[in-house]
């Protein structure tokens, strides 16, 4: 690298300048790209040029011929200094570019952009099975074009089916697939695939308490800030209301709050001691595809007919599993926690076969929010007198946490902008600048220390 740099400087000299011509410091820097700091430190001041200033004073400054410069840049210490200085200057320039890039994705920048949109908000607040999403979806049916933004592919598919079944043509877009309906101007998608280029009459953002999720929360923050619709329905669990009210107020947009209550009571009914205690309309909760399939197979061998629901289930297979359950061809559901995010089935009892889950980093016990979300699927108003939550075995933690108030959300999450990876800025600089960005109490930055450590 150093030898290439020396030859590059010498070739510039040979093409443009006679060997007897002398150059000042500014000319050396401009014509040959040799940094001023290197000239100051390494270049001798033997030959001087004198000029008369307008004031009448004579000014003297050092000059160098191209022959002298060629000799100097061949010195290894000077060549290395030039290369290091250029690298440092490039890194500083890239650091400033990264800072400017991240500033454009900051909460302040999002809020400023949100203020330019003409929108009104309806904040739907309530526990699972309280009808908050139903009310928002009914408004979308009446005021199209609209978009529905889901936390899960399965939920996007469910709303896609509901809208089309109601005579509201709707397409679906998720990370795994797209189903485009000719003539449809409504769309159901996972929240990361929100279309920010369109103007809608109605937008429905579901499960907005996930704005605090360290992995995906930024998608909810961006959607709430930037989805372009006349009316934006934001559906959330109670713990998210205070934070999201404060966020929407920052937009200077009008908003109303609609509170929803469960119409079917929910109780903890203790334990079931084995699969022989299962009943019709039970949902067995596991936390992996493998566990779901093995549990369903065990039930089939013991006389039950089970439908299975998990996140990676293909759309047609999912439709068929739901159809079989609704038609009475199966009488039990075995599902992952995907069932907690709005998958609408007439379930009377939710039974936790497992009380720990792998969250991407470690196995841990279910928290209160997860227990309320999943357990809340039990009980359908008009079909069951109450919903019941049970656990397989003797674990009492589920009962201790069910129905407890979840700590209020205090901060939304900001993800490292993946658009930054499409720039020419080295990843190491991007990660360092990201980690050094100012901290805020109301927004939590995605922690990139682990990927940064892998680059060291």
Q: What does each model-found stretch correspond to?
A:
Residues 145-156, 234, 278-299:
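Conserved strand-helix element at the start of the C-terminal RecA-like helicase core
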Residues 253-296:
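Conserved interdomain linker/interface between the two RecA-like ATPase lobes of SF2 helicase motors
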Residues 409-456:
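Long, largely alpha-helical accessory region at the distal end of helicase-like NTP-driven motors
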Residues 212-260:
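Post-DEXD/H (motif II) to motif III coupling segment of the RecA-like Helicase ATP-binding lobe
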Residues 311-312, 328-331, 337-382:
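Conserved RecA-like helicase motor core of SF1/SF2 enzymes
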Residues 163-197:
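Inter-Walker segment of RecA-like/P-loop motor cores
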Residues 367-406:
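Conserved segment of the helicase C-terminal RecA-like domain
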Residues 26, 43-78:
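Short helix-start
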């Amino acid at each position: 690298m150093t030898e290439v740099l020396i030859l590059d400087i010498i070739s510039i000299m040979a093409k443009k300048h006679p060997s007897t011509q002398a150059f000042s410091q500014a000319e050396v820097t401009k014509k040959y790209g040799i940094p001023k700091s290197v000239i100051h430190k390494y270049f001798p001041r033997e030959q001087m040029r004198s000029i008369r200033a307008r004031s009448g004073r004579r000014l003297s400054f050092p000059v160098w011929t191209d022959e002298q410069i060629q000799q100097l840049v061949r010195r290894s210490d000077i060549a290395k200094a030039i290369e290091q200085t250029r690298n440092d200057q490039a890194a500083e320039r890239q650091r400033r570019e990264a800072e400017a890039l991240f500033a454009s994705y900051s909460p302040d920048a999002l809020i400023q952009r949100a203020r330019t949109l003409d929108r009104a908000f309806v904040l739907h607040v309530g526990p699972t099975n309280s009808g908050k999403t139903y009310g928002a979806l009914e408004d979308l049916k009446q005021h199209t074009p609209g978009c529905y933004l889901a936390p899960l592919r399965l939920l996007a598919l469910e709303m896609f089916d509901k809208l089309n079944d109601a005579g509201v043509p709707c397409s679906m877009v998720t990370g795994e697939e797209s189903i485009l309906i000719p003539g449809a101007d409504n769309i159901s998608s996972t929240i990361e695939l929100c279309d920010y280029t369109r103007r809608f009459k109605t937008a429905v953002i579901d499960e907005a308490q996930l704005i605090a999720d360290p992995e995906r929360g930024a998608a909810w923050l961006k959607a709430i800030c930037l989805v372009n619709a006349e009316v934006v329905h934001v559906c959330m669990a109670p713990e998210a209301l205070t934070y999201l009210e404060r966020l929407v107020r920052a937009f200077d947009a009008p908003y109303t709050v609609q509170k929803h209550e469960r119409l079917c009571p929910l109780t903890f009914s203790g334990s079931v001691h084995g699969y022989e205690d299962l009943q019709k309309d039970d949902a067995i909760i596991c936390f992996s595809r493998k566990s779901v399939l093995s549990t369903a197979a065990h039930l089939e061998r013991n006389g039950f007919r089970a439908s299975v629901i998990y996140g990676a289930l293909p759309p047609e297979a999912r439709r068929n599993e739901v159809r079989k359950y609704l038609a009475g061809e199966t009488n039990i559901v075995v599902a992952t926690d995907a069932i907690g995010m709005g998958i609408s089935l007439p379930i009377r009892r939710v039974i936790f076969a497992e009380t720990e889950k792998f969250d991407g980093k470690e196995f841990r016990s279910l928290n209160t929010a997860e227990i309320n979300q999943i357990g809340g699927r039990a009980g359908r108003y008009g079909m069951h007198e109450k919903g019941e939550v049970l656990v397989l075995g003797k674990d009492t933690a589920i009962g201790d946490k069910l129905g407890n108030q979840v700590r209020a959300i205090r901060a939304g999450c900001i993800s490292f902008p993946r658009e930054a990876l499409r720039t020419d800025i080295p990843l190491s600089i991007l990660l360092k600048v990201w980690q050094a960005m100012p901290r805020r109490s109301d927004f939590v930055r995605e922690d990139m220390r682990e990927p940064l450590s892998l680059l060291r």
